[in-house]
Amino acid sequence: MVGVFLCLEDDMTNEKENQKKTAAGYRTATKLVRGGTLRSAFNETSEAIFMNSGFVYDSAEQAAGRFKGDNEGFIYSRYANPTISMFEERMILLEGAEAARGTASGMAAVNAALLSQVKAGDHVVAPKALFGSCLYIIENILPRFGVDITLINGTDLDQWRNAVTDKTACVFFETPSNPALEIVDIAAVSEIAHKVGAKVIVDNVFATPILQKPLQLGA
């Protein structure tokens, strides 16, 4: 990476908050281009690509506070850096989310989303019609951690109702599915899942937040 934002920590935090308030009123096209952007002191026209692994601190005390999580700021690019942070803020705006986490690939995102919601003994329900790599994670990876899996016809709400139990930690589906283009009723399945306390994970890769916002439909 080429450097560090040349501003005080409090100034950076205030600037982020001000930008969030401004961006909330953007139209979708503007959010796509400008959402989450936080320019450095060099006033670049588009998002800078930060390639450094570490960051500089004004003092040992500031560094200690950052690593302890007592104050905001970047510490190591494996956790976060300005480039990824801008991407995450843009996705928050587009999806209407509270938080986001960028990953290196779509399958990394799917794997992280699932593993963060389950533990040994939990249960996951998903449609049979999934992208091959997603299906592999659910059928082959999760069971290695002691997670039970039920695969169903995702277009049949009765099958969702019959599949979820009090051990169901989450449900996962794509809509439209890849590549079969099956459509799952997000609102209805979310209602079914939430009745047993299960989380809802929706792979929105085909529709994108331009055409569909799962969080607004109950996911």
Where are these regions (language model features)?
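Conserved N-terminal alpha-helix of the aminotransferase class I/II PLP-enzyme fold
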Residues: 59-108, 133-140
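N-terminal "arm"/small-domain region of PLP-dependent enzymes with the aminotransferase-like
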Residues: 13-81, 89
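A generic structural signal for short, solvent-exposed coil/turn residues
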Residues: 24-25, 43, 68, 94, ...
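Conserved PLP-enzyme active-site core in the AAT-like
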Residues: 19-23, 32-38, 100-219
